[in-house]
UniProtKB/Swiss-Prot annotation:
Belongs to the insect apolipophorin-3 family. This is Apolipophorin-3. Hemolymph. GO terms for biological process: lipid transport. Equilibrium between a soluble monomer and a bound lipoprotein form. Apolipophorin-3 associates with lipophorin during lipid loading until each particle contains 9 or 14 molecules of apolipophorin-3. Induction: By bacterial infection. GO terms for cellular component: extracellular region. It comes from Heliothis virescens.
Amino acid sequence: DAPASPLADIEKHAAEFQKTISEQFNSLVNSKNTQ
């Protein structure tokens, strides 16, 4: 299941990275709200 191009692979990784950052940010905000 190789990507069509290196650019497509980069975009896929970027989207996953963005999602991870968003989740970490949300958990950080939520933990601050509960304190």
